[in-house]
């Protein structure tokens, strides 16, 4: 049973344009991003949301760990567990594992962010700066360039040929 003065929670579903997502991320009624992802991807919505400089509460697993700084974002611990049989299909095998959060920890963090929003808002601004500084297109271009340089062999390069001059007075034998 949940009681007390709690905020409204809305579940949104459907296809959203980039403009829709930007408006949603920056809407004044949106106070935080909460994602209990099981590890389905690198976490693009979390990365985008960080630019809004609002608190992020997310699973402490998978791709978002590359860009969410635990000093600034709230990471929910958990453990790998088998995919639920009802979710298994030909792409998601029952032998696979996904991440399950520790719900008690998640509840505690949700309440703390709600009660001490200003504190978490300051950390979120630092997370936004961290993203802009370390994950800009320019920075990613530099990093990808370094990886390519280190892992792709040097290819042959075109060079100018210096052939001897042809002597027009040379008589070539006739072939019959």
Where are these regions (language model features)?
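A short, glycine- and acidic-residue-rich donor-binding loop in the catalytic cores
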Residues: 42-48, 56, 63
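Short hydrophobic beta-strand element within catalytic cores of glycosyltransferases
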Residues: 55-58, 74-77
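A short alpha->beta transition loop at the rim of the catalytic pocket in nucleotide-sugar-dependent
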Residues: 29-31, 53, 60
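Short glycine/proline-enriched, acidic/aromatic patches that form the donor-sugar handling elements
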Residues: 21, 43, 62-67, 81-88
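Nucleotide-activated donor-binding/catalytic signature segment of Leloir-type glycosyltransferases, i.e.
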Residues: 1-19, 24, 31
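C-terminal amphipathic helix plus adjacent low-complexity
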Residues: 90-176
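Aromatic "clamp/platform" in nucleotide-sugar-dependent glycosyltransferases that forms part
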Residues: 38
């Amino acid at each position: 049973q949940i009681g007390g003065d709690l905020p409204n929670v809305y579940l949104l579903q459907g296809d959203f344009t980039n403009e829709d997502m930007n408006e949603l991320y920056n809407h004044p009624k949106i106070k935080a991003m909460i994602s209990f992802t099981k590890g389905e991807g690198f976490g693009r919505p979390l990365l985008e949301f960080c630019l809004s400089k609002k608190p992020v509460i997310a699973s402490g697993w998978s791709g978002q760990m590359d860009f969410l700084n635990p000093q600034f974002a709230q990471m929910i611990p958990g453990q790998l567990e088998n995919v639920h049989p009802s979710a298994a299909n030909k792409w998601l095998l029952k032998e696979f594992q996904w991440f399950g959060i520790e719900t008690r920890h998640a509840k505690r963090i949700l309440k703390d962010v709600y009660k001490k929003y200003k504190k978490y808002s300051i950390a979120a601004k630092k997370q936004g700066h961290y993203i802009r500084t370390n994950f800009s297109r320019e920075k990613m271009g530099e990093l990808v360039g370094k990886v390519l340089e280190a892992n792709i062999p040097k290819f042959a390069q075109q060079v100018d040929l210096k052939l001897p001059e042809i002597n027009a007075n040379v008589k070539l034998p006739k072939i019959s």
